[in-house]
Amino acid sequence: MFNKLRISLPQAGLLLLCAAWLLPGLVGHAPWKGGDGDHFVLLLQLLRDGGVLQAEPPLYYWTAAATAWLTAPFLPLHDGARLASGLFIALTLVFVLRTARALYGSEAGWAAVLLLLGCLGLLVRGHELNAHTAQFAGAAMLLHGLVRVAQGTRGGMVFAVGAALMLLAGGAAETLLFLLLAGSAPLCFEAYRGAAARRGLAVATGATLAFAAAWLAFLSAQGAPLAAMLGLDRWFAPGNLEPAYYPAMLAWFAWPAWPLAAWAVYRERRQWRTPGIALPVLLLLGLLAMYAFVAAPGEEHGLVLLLPLALLGAAGLFTLRRGAANALLWFGLMLFGFVGLLFWVYWSAHDLGMPARLAARLTRLGMTDVGTLRPWAPALGVIATLLWIGFLTRVQRSPLRPVLVWTAGLTFIWALLMALFQGPLDRRHSYVGVAEQLAAQVPADACIQTYAVRATQRQLLAYHSGRFLVPADLGCDWLLIETRQREAEPHVSPNWVKQWEGARP
């Protein structure tokens, strides 16, 4: 069905591209507002409570604690912890590579990896403290086990290990979906009806159910909230159902994988009962059906949706017509070339003050260091730009070239953004600046009670300032109040005297 093409592409170069995508932005900045900070606060809670999380799936936080401990001599806690996301993304790439090779042939493996890294939605989510990257890796392992289980017990063991990771990461519903797919595979595919497949399926289901029973028994003995620990609270959280949220999100989140996936399904529509088409399609449809009933959906939960689309996209890439391939190629070249030029213009305004009108606009946006030259930033930016240009002059014509150029361009843009603007972004999106101002006003041994300060902000301010912040009145000598734009300042006792006010840029 699929051509097992042999394309001469240096493996080391592709590995370097993966590393270039993964490393920039993973370290070198404080926890940012949003998911990055939220997950870091949960890690602080785990470290404070001795490795126990009361209402969160633990796998990611255990791993983050381990990477933070291993890198403590040379990295801050938050940077070391963020490496856990890099580990889970790398594990995901390994199993996507192996799954695509098993389904479509050797060169389809790198096509699937490049398509996954080229998806716009993974770029930010894959570089922050993000517990859902653990589910991402578990799902990739489960999918590989599901594909290989027809060959015997080794595939069944991979499936079971992936299921264990998924359960520890809070993906009980996704694990159940994979079990249903495994159970129905003999009814749909002839390859799953042999003796080796029966042994593999027996190992997969038996080991998965045994681990699930042991995990449930442990959680029950600990008195943990089962819905939260298993990730089932997503379907019961307060919020409105948005059935169309994830299909609409995939239009940009999974670009450019989804058009290639759609082409593969159309091209192989007469072969729809083969595992290479049917398994990813059934997984995608099953996930979308489940996620349609998630209360308060969000991007983080959509990472798993990228896996079947990347696999199908790899299948479609090698049959893509020349006009469509050239369109993707030139669109990537023009888009990333324009964005790269735009970044350099903004760097010139930020560091050199030229053009003056743009520099004045950046100042009005709250950037306090406009006009201050940072020599290392343009040096790193020039290196990234020259590497990208050098890559474009050497990339060879092949079926992989459109997606290779796209992913390399996206990697260049991300690396350039981190090189030129990681410092300003850190000041704007983290609480370091506010915490430093707070620490300068309050003695190190002081107690600060807070009013209307959200728990995540309070703990991040305490982490960065080294001060003791509490949520209630414990007789502290200092009071910290949060007010928001367009809201009146809350009434406080006249006994309190304002000493300082500050805000993020």
Regions found by a protein language model. Give the residues of each.
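Membrane-integral, polyisoprenol-dependent glycosyltransferases
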Residues: 1-326, 461
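Membrane-embedded architecture of ER/inner-membrane glycosylation machinery
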Residues: 2-4, 149-176, 186-206, 222, ...
